[in-house]
Amino acid sequence: SICDYYKREYGVGYKPTDIVVTMGASEALTMTFTTIIDPGDEILIAEPFYSNYQTFALVRGGNIRPIPTSSKEGYRYAAKDKLEAALTDKTKAIVCINPGNPTGLALTTEEMDVIADFVIENDLWLIADEAYREYVYDGMKPRSFANIDRLKENLIVIDSVSKRFSACGARIGFVASKNEEFMTGIIKLAQSRLCVSTLEQIGSTELFKLPSSYYEEMKEEYCKRRDAAYEEIMKIPDVICHKPGGAFYMMV
């Protein structure tokens, strides 16, 4: 059902062998970092970021190298000069949470292409955390890094049932990549813990069959909440708050 979802919504042709179901996106991330990180490797990620990324990297001998951002610039980081300034000879990958947690930054098509070029030019892994992908506002259209064909061998997509379908207790996520060598490593790790809950997988299978109207209804509701919260927050003297373009977070 995950393959059908990607084909239906994004025109991406994943095969079942390109996907491993995990116990939430967190396990997908820990497996990914275990597979690609060697001691001393650095992972680029725009700051502020979901704090557990720091733990995921450190316990595997890697280090997070933050890309500084500013609220005044809307937390935007996908510019060639900013990316290259963070690059070192130890850089192994860049993580892109799109839309962002906790900034709500939604990357434009042009920004995604800049990141793709940077990844390919420097032979890096791109770890695309797309758990909030459908929830972009103000006329933006959802897009996956998987839509960028030239990233085929460099791209690792992390996804989650809990955010997209409000099913946090289900603990169902997955990792997707067309890089066969990477997926071989993921399969070995997955075999070490047998399997994810069968019952929860059955339920999640049906969630991925929901029509596009589901996302539109959820997006409309989240957008209303965002606008209402932003309007009240901006009444506070001297407050700094950038209206998020996606997800359901707001930095104040």
Where does each model-flagged region fall?
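Active-site phosphate-binding strand-loop segment of PLP-dependent enzymes
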Residues: 70-140
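Conserved PLP-anchoring active-site segment centered on the Schiff-base-forming lysine
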Residues: 35-57
